[in-house]
Protein backbone atom coordinates (compact mmCIF):
# COMPACT_ATOMS: atom_id res chain seq x y z
CA UNK A 1 0.00 0.00 0.00
CA UNK A 2 1.21 3.53 -0.74
CA UNK A 3 2.30 5.78 2.10
CA UNK A 4 -0.37 7.88 3.82
CA UNK A 5 0.09 11.45 4.98
CA UNK A 6 1.47 11.81 8.51
CA UNK A 7 -1.21 14.35 9.43
CA UNK A 8 -4.03 11.81 9.17
CA UNK A 9 -2.43 8.97 11.13
CA UNK A 10 -4.33 9.93 14.28
CA UNK A 11 -7.58 10.51 12.38
CA UNK A 12 -10.47 8.53 13.83
CA UNK A 13 -14.11 8.20 12.78
CA UNK A 14 -16.58 10.46 14.59
CA UNK A 15 -17.70 8.57 17.71
CA UNK A 16 -21.16 10.10 17.60
CA UNK A 17 -21.68 9.09 13.98
CA UNK A 18 -20.30 5.60 14.69
CA UNK A 19 -22.76 4.93 17.53
CA UNK A 20 -25.65 6.30 15.50
CA UNK A 21 -24.66 4.10 12.56
CA UNK A 22 -24.51 0.97 14.75
CA UNK A 23 -27.94 1.71 16.22
CA UNK A 24 -29.40 2.21 12.74
CA UNK A 25 -27.76 -1.01 11.53
CA UNK A 26 -29.44 -2.96 14.34
CA UNK A 27 -32.77 -1.39 13.43
CA UNK A 28 -32.31 -2.46 9.82
CA UNK A 29 -31.92 -6.02 11.11
CA UNK A 30 -35.34 -5.74 12.71
CA UNK A 31 -33.99 -5.20 16.24
CA UNK A 32 -35.90 -2.61 18.26
CA UNK A 33 -33.36 0.00 19.35
CA UNK A 34 -34.14 3.30 21.05
CA UNK A 35 -31.56 5.67 19.62
CA UNK A 36 -30.54 8.32 22.14
CA UNK A 37 -27.24 8.97 20.40
CA UNK A 38 -28.47 11.16 17.56
CA UNK A 39 -27.03 14.64 17.13
CA UNK A 40 -29.96 15.98 15.16
CA UNK A 41 -33.56 17.02 15.86
CA UNK A 42 -36.17 14.31 15.33
CA UNK A 43 -38.45 16.89 13.69
CA UNK A 44 -38.79 17.27 9.94
CA UNK A 45 -37.79 20.47 8.15
CA UNK A 46 -40.80 22.86 8.14
CA UNK A 47 -42.82 22.70 4.92
CA UNK A 48 -42.42 26.38 4.02
CA UNK A 49 -38.64 25.89 3.93
CA UNK A 50 -38.98 22.84 1.68
CA UNK A 51 -41.29 24.77 -0.63
CA UNK A 52 -38.74 27.58 -0.94
CA UNK A 53 -36.12 25.05 -1.99
CA UNK A 54 -38.47 23.46 -4.53
CA UNK A 55 -39.25 26.88 -5.97
CA UNK A 56 -35.55 27.64 -6.26
CA UNK A 57 -35.12 24.46 -8.28
CA UNK A 58 -38.09 25.31 -10.48
CA UNK A 59 -36.67 28.80 -10.97
CA UNK A 60 -33.41 27.33 -12.25
CA UNK A 61 -31.12 27.95 -9.27
CA UNK A 62 -29.04 24.94 -10.31
CA UNK A 63 -25.82 26.50 -11.61
CA UNK A 64 -22.57 27.56 -9.97
CA UNK A 65 -22.79 30.59 -7.71
CA UNK A 66 -20.14 32.65 -5.91
CA UNK A 67 -18.13 30.71 -3.32
CA UNK A 68 -19.15 32.95 -0.36
CA UNK A 69 -22.81 32.14 -1.00
CA UNK A 70 -25.96 33.84 -2.26
CA UNK A 71 -25.88 37.55 -1.50
CA UNK A 72 -29.51 37.39 -0.39
CA UNK A 73 -28.67 34.67 2.16
CA UNK A 74 -25.64 36.54 3.47
CA UNK A 75 -27.81 39.63 3.90
CA UNK A 76 -30.38 37.51 5.75
CA UNK A 77 -27.64 36.18 8.06
CA UNK A 78 -26.53 39.74 8.81
CA UNK A 79 -30.11 40.77 9.55
CA UNK A 80 -30.63 37.75 11.81
CA UNK A 81 -27.49 38.65 13.79
CA UNK A 82 -28.70 42.22 14.24
CA UNK A 83 -32.18 41.08 15.29
CA UNK A 84 -31.02 38.36 17.69
CA UNK A 85 -27.80 39.82 19.09
CA UNK A 86 -27.69 43.48 18.13
CA UNK A 87 -24.46 42.83 16.17
CA UNK A 88 -24.01 44.56 12.81
CA UNK A 89 -22.21 42.71 10.03
CA UNK A 90 -21.99 43.17 6.28
CA UNK A 91 -22.28 40.43 3.61
CA UNK A 92 -18.52 40.51 2.92
CA UNK A 93 -18.04 39.42 6.55
CA UNK A 94 -20.06 36.23 5.95
CA UNK A 95 -19.03 32.95 4.33
CA UNK A 96 -21.74 30.35 3.67
CA UNK A 97 -20.37 26.83 4.10
CA UNK A 98 -21.39 23.22 3.64
CA UNK A 99 -22.60 22.92 7.22
CA UNK A 100 -21.17 24.59 10.32
CA UNK A 101 -18.51 21.88 10.44
CA UNK A 102 -16.89 23.24 7.27
CA UNK A 103 -16.98 26.75 8.70
CA UNK A 104 -14.90 25.56 11.67
CA UNK A 105 -12.55 23.57 9.44
CA UNK A 106 -11.98 26.47 7.03
CA UNK A 107 -11.20 28.82 9.90
CA UNK A 108 -8.72 26.45 11.56
CA UNK A 109 -6.93 25.81 8.26
CA UNK A 110 -6.73 29.56 7.70
CA UNK A 111 -5.31 30.46 11.11
CA UNK A 112 -3.18 27.57 12.40
CA UNK A 113 0.50 27.13 11.62
CA UNK A 114 2.33 23.93 12.51
CA UNK A 115 2.71 23.66 16.28
CA UNK A 116 0.24 26.42 17.14
CA UNK A 117 -1.90 25.65 20.19
CA UNK A 118 -5.65 26.10 20.46
CA UNK A 119 -7.49 25.91 23.78
CA UNK A 120 -10.50 23.60 24.04
CA UNK A 121 -12.68 23.42 27.13
CA UNK A 122 -13.60 19.88 28.16
CA UNK A 123 -16.10 18.36 27.65
CA UNK A 124 -16.03 19.40 24.01
CA UNK A 125 -17.61 18.55 20.67
CA UNK A 126 -15.82 15.53 19.28
CA UNK A 127 -14.39 17.10 16.12
CA UNK A 128 -12.58 20.12 17.58
CA UNK A 129 -9.32 18.34 18.54
CA UNK A 130 -9.23 16.29 15.34
CA UNK A 131 -9.70 19.33 13.11
CA UNK A 132 -6.91 21.18 14.92
CA UNK A 133 -4.59 18.20 14.47
CA UNK A 134 -5.39 17.94 10.75
CA UNK A 135 -4.41 21.63 10.49
CA UNK A 136 -1.12 20.59 12.20
CA UNK A 137 -1.98 22.44 15.37
CA UNK A 138 -2.00 21.21 18.96
CA UNK A 139 -5.28 20.98 20.90
CA UNK A 140 -4.74 22.05 24.52
CA UNK A 141 -7.55 20.54 26.59
CA UNK A 142 -8.61 22.42 29.72
CA UNK A 143 -10.59 20.16 32.03
CA UNK A 144 -13.62 21.16 34.07
CA UNK A 145 -15.93 19.50 36.57
CA UNK A 146 -19.67 19.03 36.83
CA UNK A 147 -19.49 20.53 40.31
CA UNK A 148 -18.52 23.85 38.68
CA UNK A 149 -21.09 23.62 35.87
CA UNK A 150 -18.33 22.57 33.48
CA UNK A 151 -16.80 26.06 33.58
CA UNK A 152 -13.04 25.67 34.11
CA UNK A 153 -11.32 27.96 36.57
CA UNK A 154 -9.97 30.95 34.67
CA UNK A 155 -6.64 30.44 36.43
CA UNK A 156 -6.50 26.91 35.01
CA UNK A 157 -7.20 28.24 31.52
CA UNK A 158 -4.45 30.83 31.92
CA UNK A 159 -1.98 28.14 33.03
CA UNK A 160 -2.50 26.42 29.69
CA UNK A 161 -1.67 29.55 27.68
CA UNK A 162 1.86 29.52 26.25
CA UNK A 163 3.68 31.63 23.64
CA UNK A 164 2.34 29.12 21.07
CA UNK A 165 -1.32 29.62 22.03
CA UNK A 166 -3.26 31.46 19.33
CA UNK A 167 -6.94 30.96 20.17
CA UNK A 168 -9.78 29.34 22.07
CA UNK A 169 -12.96 27.57 20.96
CA UNK A 170 -16.21 28.21 22.85
CA UNK A 171 -19.49 26.32 22.46
CA UNK A 172 -22.57 27.52 24.35
CA UNK A 173 -25.15 26.07 24.71
CA UNK A 174 -22.80 23.13 24.83
CA UNK A 175 -22.68 19.84 23.04
CA UNK A 176 -22.47 17.56 25.05
CA UNK A 177 -23.46 19.14 28.39
CA UNK A 178 -26.50 21.17 27.34
CA UNK A 179 -25.26 23.96 29.62
CA UNK A 180 -24.85 27.68 28.94
CA UNK A 181 -21.76 29.66 29.96
CA UNK A 182 -22.43 32.39 32.51
CA UNK A 183 -21.80 36.04 31.68
CA UNK A 184 -19.18 36.17 34.43
CA UNK A 185 -17.28 33.28 32.89
CA UNK A 186 -17.41 34.82 29.40
CA UNK A 187 -16.16 38.14 30.78
CA UNK A 188 -13.21 36.29 32.31
CA UNK A 189 -12.45 34.61 28.99
CA UNK A 190 -12.64 38.00 27.28
CA UNK A 191 -9.97 39.40 29.61
CA UNK A 192 -7.65 36.50 28.80
CA UNK A 193 -8.27 36.99 25.08
CA UNK A 194 -7.24 40.64 25.38
CA UNK A 195 -4.27 39.92 27.63
CA UNK A 196 -2.76 37.26 25.39
CA UNK A 197 -4.00 38.50 22.00
CA UNK A 198 -6.00 35.37 21.17
CA UNK A 199 -8.80 34.78 18.69
CA UNK A 200 -12.11 33.22 19.72
CA UNK A 201 -14.08 30.77 17.61
CA UNK A 202 -17.62 30.88 18.99
CA UNK A 203 -19.62 27.81 17.94
CA UNK A 204 -23.20 29.05 18.33
CA UNK A 205 -24.99 26.28 16.46
CA UNK A 206 -27.40 25.69 19.38
CA UNK A 207 -27.92 29.36 20.24
CA UNK A 208 -31.70 29.34 19.69
CA UNK A 209 -32.25 26.17 21.73
CA UNK A 210 -32.23 27.79 25.17
CA UNK A 211 -34.73 26.62 27.74
CA UNK A 212 -34.92 30.00 29.47
CA UNK A 213 -36.24 31.29 26.10
CA UNK A 214 -34.05 34.38 26.40
CA UNK A 215 -32.26 35.96 23.42
CA UNK A 216 -29.06 34.16 22.44
CA UNK A 217 -25.71 35.31 23.81
CA UNK A 218 -22.05 34.75 23.10
CA UNK A 219 -18.78 36.35 24.18
CA UNK A 220 -19.46 39.48 22.09
CA UNK A 221 -22.58 40.06 24.16
CA UNK A 222 -20.39 40.78 27.19
CA UNK A 223 -17.30 42.09 25.36
CA UNK A 224 -18.34 43.87 22.13
CA UNK A 225 -14.87 45.41 21.83
CA UNK A 226 -13.57 41.96 20.81
CA UNK A 227 -15.36 42.11 17.46
CA UNK A 228 -12.17 41.82 15.40
CA UNK A 229 -10.99 38.82 17.42
CA UNK A 230 -14.24 36.83 17.52
CA UNK A 231 -15.43 34.57 14.71
CA UNK A 232 -18.90 33.11 14.91
CA UNK A 233 -20.04 29.76 13.54
CA UNK A 234 -23.71 28.98 13.06
CA UNK A 235 -26.11 27.31 10.66
CA UNK A 236 -29.61 26.00 10.08
CA UNK A 237 -29.05 22.34 11.02
CA UNK A 238 -30.14 22.27 14.66
CA UNK A 239 -32.42 25.30 14.88
CA UNK A 240 -34.55 24.52 11.84
CA UNK A 241 -34.17 20.71 11.70
CA UNK A 242 -32.14 20.95 8.49
CA UNK A 243 -29.13 18.73 9.25
CA UNK A 244 -29.14 17.07 5.83
CA UNK A 245 -29.25 20.38 3.98
CA UNK A 246 -25.64 21.14 5.01
CA UNK A 247 -25.82 24.91 5.27
CA UNK A 248 -23.72 26.76 7.83
CA UNK A 249 -21.74 29.98 7.96
CA UNK A 250 -18.75 31.76 9.40
CA UNK A 251 -18.99 35.42 10.39
CA UNK A 252 -16.11 37.73 11.27
CA UNK A 253 -13.61 40.23 9.93
CA UNK A 254 -13.66 40.33 6.14
CA UNK A 255 -9.90 39.75 5.83
CA UNK A 256 -10.15 36.31 7.46
CA UNK A 257 -13.46 35.57 5.74
CA UNK A 258 -11.80 36.17 2.37
CA UNK A 259 -9.00 33.73 3.21
CA UNK A 260 -11.52 31.12 4.35
CA UNK A 261 -13.47 31.68 1.14
CA UNK A 262 -10.30 31.07 -0.88
CA UNK A 263 -9.74 27.78 0.97
CA UNK A 264 -13.31 26.76 0.28
CA UNK A 265 -12.99 27.80 -3.35
CA UNK A 266 -10.17 25.29 -3.77
CA UNK A 267 -12.08 22.46 -2.07
CA UNK A 268 -15.87 22.32 -2.24
CA UNK A 269 -16.61 25.74 -3.77
CA UNK A 270 -20.03 27.09 -2.74
CA UNK A 271 -22.57 25.26 -0.60
CA UNK A 272 -25.52 23.83 -2.56
CA UNK A 273 -27.25 26.73 -4.29
CA UNK A 274 -30.92 25.77 -3.92
CA UNK A 275 -30.38 24.63 -0.31
CA UNK A 276 -29.13 28.15 0.43
CA UNK A 277 -32.51 29.50 -0.67
CA UNK A 278 -34.19 27.25 1.89
CA UNK A 279 -31.84 28.58 4.56
CA UNK A 280 -32.65 32.15 3.55
CA UNK A 281 -36.38 31.55 3.99
CA UNK A 282 -35.72 29.87 7.34
CA UNK A 283 -33.97 33.00 8.60
CA UNK A 284 -36.33 35.60 7.16
CA UNK A 285 -39.67 33.95 7.94
CA UNK A 286 -41.52 33.72 11.25
CA UNK A 287 -39.49 32.00 13.96
CA UNK A 288 -42.58 30.40 15.50
CA UNK A 289 -41.56 26.88 14.43
CA UNK A 290 -38.21 27.32 16.17
CA UNK A 291 -39.94 28.40 19.37
CA UNK A 292 -42.30 25.42 19.21
CA UNK A 293 -39.42 22.99 18.73
CA UNK A 294 -37.45 24.56 21.56
CA UNK A 295 -40.46 24.29 23.86
CA UNK A 296 -40.78 20.58 23.07
CA UNK A 297 -37.09 20.03 23.77
CA UNK A 298 -37.43 21.90 27.07
CA UNK A 299 -40.32 19.65 28.10
CA UNK A 300 -38.34 16.55 27.15
CA UNK A 301 -35.31 17.78 29.08
CA UNK A 302 -37.47 18.17 32.17
CA UNK A 303 -39.02 14.73 31.70
CA UNK A 304 -35.70 12.97 31.11
CA UNK A 305 -34.16 14.68 34.14
CA UNK A 306 -37.04 13.54 36.34
CA UNK A 307 -36.81 9.97 35.07
CA UNK A 308 -33.04 9.65 35.41
CA UNK A 309 -33.15 10.90 39.00
CA UNK A 310 -34.90 7.63 39.83
CA UNK A 311 -31.82 5.62 38.85
CA UNK A 312 -29.25 5.42 41.67
CA UNK A 313 -25.67 6.11 40.66
CA UNK A 314 -26.47 8.46 37.76
CA UNK A 315 -25.65 12.12 38.33
CA UNK A 316 -26.11 15.12 36.04
CA UNK A 317 -27.00 18.79 35.73
CA UNK A 318 -30.37 19.32 34.02
CA UNK A 319 -29.80 20.73 30.52
CA UNK A 320 -30.26 24.45 29.92
CA UNK A 321 -30.39 24.07 26.15
CA UNK A 322 -29.58 21.88 23.11
CA UNK A 323 -31.12 18.39 23.13
CA UNK A 324 -28.45 16.63 25.18
CA UNK A 325 -27.99 15.54 28.77
CA UNK A 326 -24.50 14.63 30.01
CA UNK A 327 -24.84 11.92 32.66
CA UNK A 328 -22.14 10.78 35.05
CA UNK A 329 -22.24 6.97 35.15
CA UNK A 330 -18.84 6.06 36.62
CA UNK A 331 -20.54 4.68 39.75
CA UNK A 332 -21.23 1.60 37.61
CA UNK A 333 -17.61 1.08 36.57
CA UNK A 334 -15.83 -2.03 37.86
CA UNK A 335 -19.13 -3.89 37.98
CA UNK A 336 -19.81 -6.95 35.85
CA UNK A 337 -22.56 -7.85 33.44
CA UNK A 338 -24.56 -11.09 33.82
CA UNK A 339 -22.18 -12.55 31.21
CA UNK A 340 -19.17 -11.65 33.38
CA UNK A 341 -17.89 -8.75 31.29
CA UNK A 342 -16.50 -5.84 33.30
CA UNK A 343 -17.80 -2.30 32.82
CA UNK A 344 -14.50 -0.44 32.70
CA UNK A 345 -15.28 2.89 31.07
CA UNK A 346 -17.83 4.91 29.11
CA UNK A 347 -17.29 2.78 26.00
CA UNK A 348 -18.02 -0.56 27.71
CA UNK A 349 -20.93 1.08 29.57
CA UNK A 350 -22.45 2.29 26.30
CA UNK A 351 -21.86 -1.06 24.62
CA UNK A 352 -23.63 -2.81 27.48
CA UNK A 353 -26.67 -0.53 27.20
CA UNK A 354 -26.86 -1.12 23.46
CA UNK A 355 -26.41 -4.90 23.74
CA UNK A 356 -28.55 -5.46 26.84
CA UNK A 357 -31.12 -2.64 26.91
CA UNK A 358 -31.11 -1.85 23.19
CA UNK A 359 -30.60 1.82 24.02
CA UNK A 360 -27.91 3.80 22.20
CA UNK A 361 -25.98 6.56 24.00
CA UNK A 362 -22.58 8.09 23.22
CA UNK A 363 -19.51 7.35 25.38
CA UNK A 364 -18.25 10.43 27.21
CA UNK A 365 -14.66 9.71 26.24
CA UNK A 366 -15.56 11.02 22.78
CA UNK A 367 -16.13 14.41 24.43
CA UNK A 368 -13.06 14.25 26.66
CA UNK A 369 -14.63 12.89 29.87
CA UNK A 370 -14.73 9.13 30.39
CA UNK A 371 -16.96 9.28 33.47
CA UNK A 372 -19.99 10.36 31.44
CA UNK A 373 -22.26 9.40 28.56
CA UNK A 374 -24.23 11.76 26.35
CA UNK A 375 -27.94 11.10 26.12
CA UNK A 376 -29.90 12.78 23.33
CA UNK A 377 -33.55 13.61 23.94
CA UNK A 378 -34.20 14.21 20.25
CA UNK A 379 -36.76 11.44 20.52
CA UNK A 380 -40.39 11.08 21.58
CA UNK A 381 -41.47 11.25 25.22
CA UNK A 382 -42.79 7.71 24.87
CA UNK A 383 -39.38 6.45 23.76
CA UNK A 384 -37.61 8.41 26.49
CA UNK A 385 -39.81 6.73 29.10
CA UNK A 386 -39.20 3.29 27.58
CA UNK A 387 -35.47 3.92 27.34
CA UNK A 388 -35.08 4.90 30.99
CA UNK A 389 -37.02 1.80 32.09
CA UNK A 390 -34.72 -0.36 29.96
CA UNK A 391 -31.61 1.41 31.27
CA UNK A 392 -32.73 0.99 34.87
CA UNK A 393 -33.40 -2.71 34.33
CA UNK A 394 -30.05 -3.27 32.63
CA UNK A 395 -28.09 -1.43 35.32
CA UNK A 396 -29.92 -3.40 38.00
CA UNK A 397 -28.37 -6.59 36.59
CA UNK A 398 -24.81 -5.40 37.12
CA UNK A 399 -22.94 -6.89 40.05
Regions found by a protein language model. Name each.
Residues 8:
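Substrate/cofactor-recognition hotspot
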Residues 19, 36, 52, 58-64, ...:
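Glycine-rich loop-to-alpha-helix module at the N-terminal edge of alpha/beta enzyme cores
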Residues 64-97:
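Conserved N-terminal alpha-helix of the aminotransferase class I/II PLP-enzyme fold
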Residues 2-4, 12-14, 19-22, 26-32, ...:
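PLP-dependent class I/II
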Amino acid sequence: MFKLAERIKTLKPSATLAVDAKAKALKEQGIDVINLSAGEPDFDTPEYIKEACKKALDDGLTKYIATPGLLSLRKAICQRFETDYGFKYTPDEVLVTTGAKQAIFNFLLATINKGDEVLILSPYWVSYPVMIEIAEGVPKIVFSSMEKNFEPDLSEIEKNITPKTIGIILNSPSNPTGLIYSDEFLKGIAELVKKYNLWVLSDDIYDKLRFDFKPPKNILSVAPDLREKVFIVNGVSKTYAMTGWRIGWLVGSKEIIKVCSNIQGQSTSHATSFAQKGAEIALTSSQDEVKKMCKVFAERAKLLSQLLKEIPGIDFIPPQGTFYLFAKVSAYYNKKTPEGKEIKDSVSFSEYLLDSARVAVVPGIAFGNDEFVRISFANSEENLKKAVIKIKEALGKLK
